[in-house]
Regions:
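The AdoMet/dcAdoMet-binding core of the Class I SAM-like
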Residues: 31-160, 169-174
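A general beta-strand register signal
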Residues: 20-21
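SAM/dcSAM-binding transferase cores
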Residues: 8, 180, 201-256
Length: 256
């Protein structure tokens, strides 16, 4: 167990390596691809131009690993508030980040994601991934209206914000608030659902938002074929189905 800025961290080995932060599961070797592939590929497989990417959180390296598969990415800024997460992941969870940590396009910044976004110039990033833990003292602002507005400001006109948007079961109110907030700020937003067995209730969500019409259904098919071969979970059919899985109780809440 290690103490860090945001709490106590533990790497568990007995039933497959996993990372726990203050009693909450963050990731595991067994389940992480359910999460990381769903966060990254719906956004990046729809982009065919040179792009700058920002990852807020993501200290385990999984989001970076999926991003570096795309040749059109010019730059990746990883902004992680807790350096210990990166150190622990590199030492004990090497299988997640792997060689992606050494990619020349990657720059690691130990910094507060909210402050980083505020000091970034307009229209700088083409894709922003919010790969953060559940709302807490240290991450609440990453779910706020003001933060999402700042993300919109620093995105290019056709840029995409991709965020984990919690469980519609275990964190229903937070989930609905995220969806309503993004819908209010961006022209379009779409949410997909899938399984992440290690997380509360086992069902999770990811939301994608843009100021232009999202092209998530208009993928670069050559890119899709190449990326699908390297994925364990994600493929285009999986994605298309996952975007149609919104529980009816969530639909009713959003329409009310």
């Amino acid at each position: 167990i290690r103490k860090s800025l945001v709490g106590s961290e533990m790497c568990i080995r007995d039933s497959g390596k996993a990372l726990m932060l203050d009693g909450c599961w963050m990731t595991s070797l067994k389940d992480e691809k359910y999460y990381h592939e769903c966060l990254v590929h719906p956004a990046l497989s729809s982009i065919d131009e040179k792009s700058n990417v920002l990852i807020i959180g993501g200290g385990d390296g999984g989001t970076v690993r999926e991003c570096v598969k795309y040749s059109q990415i010019s730059k990746i800024d990883l902004v992680e508030i807790d350096e210990e997460v990166i150190k622990i992941s590199k030492k004990f969870l090497k299988e997640i980040g792997g060689e992606a940590w050494n990619d020349k396009r990657l720059e690691i910044h130990v910094d507060d994601g909210v402050k980083w976004v505020k000091k970034t110039k307009d229209n700088f990033y083409d894709v922003i991934f919010i790969d953060c833990s559940d709302p807490s003292e240290f991450s609440n602002l990453l779910f706020s209206h003001s933060f999402y507005k700042e993300c919109k400001r620093i995105l290019s006109p056709r840029g995409i914000l991709a965020t984990q948007s919690e469980s519609p079961e275990s964190f229903k109110n937070i989930h609905i608030n995220i969806l309503k907030t993004l819908k209010n700020i961006f022209k379009v937003s779409e949410t997909m659902y899938s399984f992440v067995p290690i997380y509360p209730s086992g069902i999770w969500s990811w939301t994608f938002a843009s100021s232009e019409d999202l092209s998530l259904s208009k993928q670069n098919y050559d890119e899709v074929v190449k990326i699908e071969k390297g994925c364990e979970i994600w493929n285009l059919n999986f994605q298309n189905a996952a975007f149609k899985m919104m529980p009816n109780k969530i639909v009713k809440e959003l329409d009310s």
